[in-house]
C-alpha cells in the first residue's frame, strides 16, 4: 500500500505484466502508479437516522483467543449496545483480536451472545432476534449478506451458477419453497435455520460444521434449488451495473476475473439475493489501491441507489475515512468510541481511546 511504501522505502520499483516499468524515488513512482485512480465519489446522506434496522441490545460474549491450540487470553465483550439506521455505512476499527470479527459473527448469526439480543428489522416496526433459531430468524437473516476475511469464490465455477446458487440460498421466496420441501423429510424450521447459517460460512468451515451435524455439503443443493439462469441474470443485471461490472462477466468462470472484480461479484451476488444489510469483515485483503477505489465507489453507489446498510471492518483507515458515515472503535471487547470517521481514526492512531 502507498502509505506503507512512503513510511519504509527510499526507492520503489513499479511492475506491470511481469516487467519493471519504473524505478525511482518513492513519491515519484507512487504518483505515476496512482495516476489512473478513479476520483472519490461522494457519500449519500443517511435519509432517516432514527430508522434503525440493526440493533445490538445489551450483548455479552466471552471468547478465547487460541493460537496453535494454545490459549492466549480470554476477552469478554461487555454490554454492547449499537443501533444502526437504514442506509448507514458504519466503519469498525480497533486493535487486532479485540472483538471486531466476533461482533460480525454475532451480527451474522454464527455465534450466540451469552446475554442480550441481536435484532434485525423484519417489518415496519418489528424486529427479530437472530440469537434465537426458527422461522423469524430465517426471515431476518435473509436480509443479511456477509463477506468474510480472506474470502475466495470457487475459481472453476461459472459466474452465472454463483448467482443462481446464492439467490436460491438467500431469497425469501426460494427459502420458503425449501422449507416446504424440508417438512416432507421431517426437517424442522430450527434445523433449516442452522443449515442456512452454515451456508453463509466460508466453505471449509461450513463443511466441517455440517459433518458435525451428520450432513454433507450436498444437503444444501438438495434442499435449496438454484434459480434458473435466465432469472438469475435478470436479478443480477442492476447490481452488476451498480458495481461497474460488464454484463458479459455473467458467462465467465470466476478464475477469469481479477481480484477487484471478484470482490464486486461477491457483493453483487448478495445484492441480487435481496440482501439489505451487508457485513464486510476485512474483505479487501491485498487489493491494490486503484482497484480498491473502484470497490469503495461501487459500495457507495449501492448505498445511494438501494439504501443498503453496511458494516465494514477494516485495518485500512483510508477506506474507513473515505467510505463510512460513522465509525466505532472496539478495544478489549467494548465499544471505546463512536464518532465521525476522521475523529475515530485519528484517536486510534494517537491511542487517545484508552
Locations of the language-model features?
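Conserved beta-strand-loop-alpha-helix hinge in the C-terminal portion
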Residues: 19-40, 334-354
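H-loop/switch region of ABC-family ATPase nucleotide-binding domains
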Residues: 1, 314-315
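Catalytic Walker B motif of ABC-type/P-loop ATPase nucleotide-binding domains
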Residues: 278-281
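Conserved catalytic motifs of ABC-family nucleotide-binding domains
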Residues: 146, 151-161
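ABC ATPase NBD Q-loop/coupling interface
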Residues: 117-139
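Q-loop/switch helix immediately C-terminal to the Walker
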Residues: 157-184, 200, 209-222
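Helix-to-loop junction immediately C-terminal to a conserved catalytic motif
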Residues: 108
